Structures are given as C-alpha cells and as structure tokens.
Amino acid sequence: MFLLDVFCVPLLGAGTSGKPRSSDMDIVTYDDVHVNFTWEEWALLDPSQKDLYRDVMLETYRNLAAIGYYWKGHNISEGHFQNSRRNGRHERSDTEEKLSEFTQYDKDFAYQSHPQRHERIYSGEKPYEGVQYFEDFAHHSSLQIQRRTHVVEKPYECNQCGKAFAYHSYLQRHERSHTGEKPYECNQCGKAFGRHSHLQRHERIHTGEKSYDCNQCGKTFVHHSHLQIHKRTHIGEKPFECNQCGKAFARNSHLLIHKRIHTGEKPYECKQCGKAFAYQSGLLYHKRRYTVEKLYECNQCGKAFACHNSLQVHKRTHTGEKPYKCNQCGKAFGRYSSLQRHERIHTGEKPYECKQCGKAFGRHSSLQRHERIHTGQKPDECSQCCKDCGCYNSLQIHKRPHTGEKYFECNQCGKGFSQNCYLEIHKRAHTVEKHY
C-alpha cells in the first residue's frame, strides 16, 4: 500500500461493499476506518510520511467523533499502532500521544445523531465524488478531508504569527514555540523538549544507541540526519553555497561560519583582553597564552609558543622559507593565509563589505580602517603626537621613536634602528665602503 492510498481511505464503511450486514445493520467497526501497513510497506516510508499518515488517521477519528460516533473500551492508541510495536518500531511521535484522548472508546461505535446519513453506508449511496482519485465518500465532511489532502488546505492558523497548518495537531505542536512549553522531559538529565520525537533522539545520548550505520565505512550515528551529512564526505556533495563568493560546503553550519568572513562578525571574545574572533577555535588557541605553558621556544630569538606548529611558522621568518606560491604570478609566502589574501588581487574578490555605504575590501583590516570614517573612531592614534596610524601594528612601530626602542641592530657596527627599513638603508653604507 502506498501512502497515497492512506490519504484516500474512505472514512465510513470501507469494506462493506455497499451490502448490509445481517446482524449489525447499525454498527460500523473500528477496522472499517483504520488502515494497517505490513512491515515491508511501512519500511518504505520516511519519517515525515509516517507522521503524516498518523495525522491523517487522527483527523479521521476526530471527524468521526465530531459527527456522533463513539467507541467503548477500545484503546485506539494501542490498537492502531500495535503492528508498529510488534515489528520493532520503537519511535512514537507526539501525534501518537494525541490519540490517548480516544483510548476509552469501544471498538464498535454506533451512529446516533444522523441515521439518514448512516444508512448511506449500507445502501451504497455516495453523493459526493472526489475529482482527483474518483474516491466516493458517504458524506460531505469526508470529501472535505480528502480535498484538503490533495490541495494542501491549511485551515488551522496560529493566532500569534499567522502560520497555517493542515492539521490541528501540527498547530498545537507549533504553538509551543510561542509559549515555550516543553512537556517531554528526560528522566536522566532533566532536559525538556517540545516534541516527543526530540526527547527520543536525545535519550540516545544516554543509552549510547547508534542505530544508523554508514554502508561504506561502517561508522555509526545516533541520528539519521547525522548519517546523511556524513555520507556527503563519500560522494563529495556540497549543497550549501555562499551567495557572495560561490564557495560550497557539505554542512549548513560550515556555511554560516564561512559567512563571517564577509560580514566581519566575531562572536567569540576573550574575557581577559577583549580580543574577538570569528571562530571558536581561534579563541581557544588564543586562550593558551593565558592558561598553557609555552614549551616551544625559538633557538634563534628565544620567542616561545604554545604550539609546535606556531613555532614552525615563526622559524620561516628566520630562514626565509616561503612554501606557499601564487600560481598566477609566482609570488611566495610564508603562510597560507597570506597567500589567500594575495590571491584576491588576481580574482578581484572583495568579501568584506561596509554595511553603511556598501564599499567592499579585500582585507578585513581595510574594512575596519574604513569604518572609522563613519564612526569617527581613532583607536590607533598616538597618545604623544596624535597621529592616526591606521592599525595596531603601525602604531607600535610609530611609537618607537618616542620611546627610544631600537629593535633592529646592525650586525657590523652595532647601531640600532626603530624600523627594519632604516636598518636596510644603513646597511648600504657598509656595502658602499667595501667597494672603495
């Protein structure tokens, strides 16, 4: 049976074949209106189809109850889903929870308030015909439910945000997003959820259950969605593309992180020094200067680092090694990030855009300097001569003549200079002397 058959299931007297039964002319049974799947059929449905099936059946029972049918002593929740439990399906959505309100009714229900309409079940009279699938229904309310499925009618509207839903149970579930109600609580850690299915997924964290296996590498996952994301590593699928630079990602979360390059957003701030970072990894790396001993020391200048990788990058400043070469102009760089910035000169990419005037820049530091035009801020102004140096590094270099610091020393005569460019100019004097 396909899910389509469920949508078109007759709500009254399915299985009577238009013929009256001798002993129970005034009875329609529970089995007449509910539909069971075999395990093979159920396995073909995805979770959203299963949820939709349950909601359609729930809506069927509600409409029957509303027009005068009733049950006695028949637990619909157990009866309707008994096959699913028997076949090992342990998931149970909040839609199923809603069926509990019908659990104290009889399997057989009698029609009380509309005997004429009830007689149509056995006479075969079906005055309303469904246009799309030619399904006949015994009364107009049944036809309306069928039509709602075909045209996706959404009569249940949220009075807070106006969002509409095809089923009342969907509306009730949605309303929890406004009220903050979380009726499903984990009995191990106390965390609460708005949906029963979300609680079930959460409980797997405690049980360690990993039901979803990758058929290529055997890796297991707690959630089906995690398995789907993992599979992209095998097929190379990257469905999430940046609309500014075109770079694609396998996960939406990775795309959101990438977009910070364009927006300049830095949500991770160091509580000790106030420095902000676009990535959490950058903040964690930065924190090591406060919490971790710097074990890796440069044997040439004595500078120490928390990570061995940082030491290796630093050593290139002494050796002059530049392993990252631009394949367009051949210029080489000591850091990969420097190569990436350089390549924007060739591509013309300017990912950093000013939110106030729309001007774009190839470097984030250039955007920051530009934004000061709008704000009037001068954070890199020299406190002694009031010169605006534009960036922090330039300010530190500028301050050296004021403080008398001379970091760059000539190895021939010992003379010191505040800037490396001055040292290079000075060295030419020694070179000229050697020629004479």
Swiss-Prot record:
GO terms for biological process: regulation of DNA-templated transcription. Residues 28-115 form the KRAB domain. It is found in: Nucleus. One of its GO terms (cellular component) is nucleus. GO terms for molecular function: DNA binding; zinc ion binding. A zinc finger (C2H2-type) spans 156-178, 184-206, 212-234, 240-262, 268-290, 296-318, 324-346, 352-374, 380-402, 408-430. Coiled coil: none annotated. The keyword Nucleus applies. Its main location: nucleus. Keywords: DNA-binding, Metal-binding, Nucleus, Repeat, Transcription, Transcription regulation, Zinc, Zinc-finger. Gene3D superfamilies: 6.10.140.140, Classic Zinc Finger. SUPFAM superfamilies: beta-beta-alpha zinc fingers, KRAB domain (Kruppel-associated box). Widely expressed with highest levels in kidney, brain, and liver, and the lowest levels in spleen. Belongs to the krueppel C2H2-type zinc-finger protein family. PANTHER family: EXPRESSED SEQUENCE AW146154-RELATED (PTHR24390:SF254), ZINC FINGER PROTEIN (PTHR24390). May be involved in transcriptional regulation. This is Zinc finger protein 120. It comes from Mus musculus (Mouse).
